[in-house]
């Protein structure tokens, strides 16, 4: 079941990725190159060299989910990630929908402070 939302942390792998890779190989990239734990609950975003394919790797409570999309025409335009490689949920959605977000300015909104 598709279980992604704004409550997840999304990390963009900035190098081109071979789309023949699946769960184990992508998990190896996450742990080996990104230094992250693949089962940590974050969603890892991988793009093909031509940016016409995208994969999202996500650990759910009982195993990995891999979401894969191939465009028949056009390319994905990835957002510029933060220093830690993260992108926001709205940026991911816009990228998947083919909307360039380079000149969009996000206006400040109230956020409920996190409880610790």
Predicted regions and their residues:
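Polybasic/polar functional segments that serve as interface/processing modules
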Residues: 1-116
């Amino acid at each position: 079941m598709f279980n992604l939302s704004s409550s997840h942390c999304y990390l963009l792998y900035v190098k081109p990725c071979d789309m023949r890779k699946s769960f184990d190989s992508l998990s190896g990239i996450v742990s080996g190159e990104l230094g992250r734990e693949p089962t940590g609950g974050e969603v890892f975003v991988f793009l093909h060299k031509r940016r016409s394919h995208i994969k999202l790797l996500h650990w759910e409570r009982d195993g990995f989910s891999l979401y894969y999309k191939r465009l028949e025409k056009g390319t994905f335009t990835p957002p510029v990630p933060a220093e830690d490689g993260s992108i926001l949920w709205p940026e991911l959605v816009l990228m998947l929908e083919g909307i360039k977000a380079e000149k969009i300015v996000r206006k400040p909104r109230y956020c409920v402070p996190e409880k610790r």
